[in-house]
Amino acid sequence: MTDVSNIAPRDKAEILAQALPYIRKFHGKTMVIKYGGNAMTDPALQADFAEDVVLLKLVGINPVVVHGGGPQIEAALKRLGKKGEFIQGMRVTDAETMEIVEWVLGGEVQQDIVGLINQAGGKAVGLTGRDGGMIRAQKLKMRDNTDASKEYDVGQVGDIVSIDPSVVKALQDDAFIPVISPIGFGENNESYNINADVVAAKLATVLKAEKLMMLTNISGVLDKAGNLLTNLSARQIDDLFLDGTISGGMLPKISGALDAAKSGVNSVHIIDGRVPHVLLLEILTDQAFGTMIRSH
């Protein structure tokens, strides 16, 4: 991993010069960033992320942050003596777990992110999908990946019905940085826990984002031998689903990324959140990180 503080001044100047055409290219464009993994738990990486987001805003790019919080939810459940359960990468969410999820995501995790961005000189505003009627949802009907006739009950896990981006756009226009917790609401005002990767992908589509970037704890999508796959097409992804290469928590991430690519998001990247300042390196330099998802 590269520590930016150890880069020589001349090299830093070259990086800044390299960034100029990308700043011109992406000025006024929206970038949706799924923030999760080690980048959320390592203090140095947290600071790097906040600085990257603020700098993007300062140069005229509009970052929108959608955050996860799996480790924090697991820690809260453990403190309360409740065991987490997952089916095909989705957290089973009963009523009690839903209350914990809302408290952890909409409170603890979100406010930490907002505070870090504001401390770095930005103007972050925390939202959940309830705010401004942003994310309408319904109970997710989860079918088995290999047997479509088999259905799982995952409780208050939501499937997105619609996203109204008007509150996000209003914040962007006023120089704010939206930080969104992946919680939706149903027709009876019930809350739904929605996978953050799915929310980020759908929001990127609705906002007509230039890029969708998903930060992970690994270098990108790996084959069964552990080698990085730098580019993936829809057909290749189908093959990786079928042979089990993509499984667990990667399932909703890759499915969401592919849906966004098919729906017009210009580029979709799954990148290594363990790399310091990976957002700036991915967006504003010639360097490429992780896996790029293509619709064809």
UniProtKB/Swiss-Prot annotation:
<dbReference type="Pfam" id="PF00696">
    <property type="entry name" value="AA_kinase"/>
</dbReference>
<dbReference type="InterPro" id="IPR001057">
    <property type="entry name" value="Glu/AcGlu_kinase"/>
</dbReference>
<dbReference type="GO" id="GO:0005737">
    <property type="term" value="C:cytoplasm"/>
</dbReference>
<keyword id="KW-0808">Transferase</keyword>
<dbReference type="InterPro" id="IPR036393">
    <property type="entry name" value="AceGlu_kinase-like_sf"/>
</dbReference>
<dbReference type="GO" id="GO:0003991">
    <property type="term" value="F:acetylglutamate kinase activity"/>
</dbReference>
<comment type="similarity">
    <text>Belongs to the acetylglutamate kinase family. ArgB subfamily.</text>
</comment>
<feature type="site" description="Transition state stabilizer">
    <location>
        <position position="34"/>
    </location>
</feature>
<protein>
    <recommendedName>
        <fullName>Acetylglutamate kinase</fullName>
        <ecNumber>2.7.2.8</ecNumber>
    </recommendedName>
</protein>
<feature type="binding site">
    <location>
        <position position="193"/>
    </location>
    <ligand>
        <name>substrate</name>
    </ligand>
</feature>
<dbReference type="GO" id="GO:0042450">
    <property type="term" value="P:arginine biosynthetic process via ornithine"/>
</dbReference>
<keyword id="KW-0547">Nucleotide-binding</keyword>
<comment type="function">
    <text>Catalyzes the ATP-dependent phosphorylation of N-acetyl-L-glutamate.</text>
</comment>
<dbReference type="InterPro" id="IPR004662">
    <property type="entry name" value="AcgluKinase_fam"/>
</dbReference>
<comment type="pathway">
    <text>Amino-acid biosynthesis; L-arginine biosynthesis; N(2)-acetyl-L-ornithine from L-glutamate: step 2/4.</text>
</comment>
<keyword id="KW-0418">Kinase</keyword>
<dbReference type="InterPro" id="IPR037528">
    <property type="entry name" value="ArgB"/>
</dbReference>
<keyword id="KW-0963">Cytoplasm</keyword>
<dbReference type="GO" id="GO:0006526">
    <property type="term" value="P:L-arginine biosynthetic process"/>
</dbReference>
<keyword id="KW-0028">Amino-acid biosynthesis</keyword>
<dbReference type="InterPro" id="IPR041727">
    <property type="entry name" value="NAGK-C"/>
</dbReference>
<feature type="site" description="Transition state stabilizer">
    <location>
        <position position="253"/>
    </location>
</feature>
<dbReference type="GO" id="GO:0005524">
    <property type="term" value="F:ATP binding"/>
</dbReference>
<keyword id="KW-0067">ATP-binding</keyword>
<feature type="binding site">
    <location>
        <position position="91"/>
    </location>
    <ligand>
        <name>substrate</name>
    </ligand>
</feature>
<dbReference type="InterPro" id="IPR001048">
    <property type="entry name" value="Asp/Glu/Uridylate_kinase"/>
</dbReference>
<keyword id="KW-0055">Arginine biosynthesis</keyword>
<feature type="binding site">
    <location>
        <begin position="69"/>
        <end position="70"/>
    </location>
    <ligand>
        <name>substrate</name>
    </ligand>
</feature>
